[in-house]
A protein has these predicted regions:
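Charged, compositionally biased, marginally structured helical/coil segments
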Residues: 1-155
Length: 155
């Protein structure tokens, strides 16, 4: 079953069970997909990879909003919890990301492969890691780890 078919089935089930949180998240994903599909110049196939990109972009926006609401304190707690639910719920359709330890190992391997040192090489290393492992790593985490590794004294 494709991701689109799963989303449609989940949407029907959420309607039947009157689960407003799931229903809102699924409708928003469909809306985001429709915006992308109707954009001028759109010509890619509407497949699982398309839906994963749409969901990933939406989840990224919701994570940022969740963090901003969480920083506002108790008044915005309900909104932050709602967004956290959406992020967790929609995450099941996204590829799994490597954890920090595995990402650090990749970063160290690329640094050794390129033979670079110093903070000025951070962009080159980050670009290489993302080029080779784009769907498996979190870009912000890679950037932080690259800067940490290049700033650390080399043995």
């Amino acid at each position: 079953m494709s991701i689109h078919e799963e989303l449609r089935a989940e949407l029907r089930e959420a309607m039947r069970s009157k689960d407003q949180r799931r229903l809102a998240a699924l409708r928003q994903v469909e809306s985001e997909a429709a915006v992308v599909k109707t954009a001028p110049g759109f010509s890619e196939p509407v497949d699982d990879a398309f839906y994963q990109r749409v969901i990933a972009a939406y989840v990224k926006k919701m994570q940022k909003a969740r963090d901003e609401y969480a920083a506002l304190g108790p008044r915005a707690q309900a909104m932050a919890e709602g967004l956290a639910f959406e992020v967790e719920y929609l995450g099941r359709w996204l590829p799994k990301k490597l954890d920090e330890a595995a990402t650090r190992a990749l970063v160290r391997g690329i640094i050794a492969e390129l033979g670079v040192t110093g903070a000025q090489a951070a962009g080159r290393v980050t670009g290489q890691v993302l080029k080779q492992h784009k769907d498996a790593v979190d870009g912000a985490l890679v950037n932080r780890l690259v800067r940490d590794e290049l700033a650390a004294p080399q043995p």
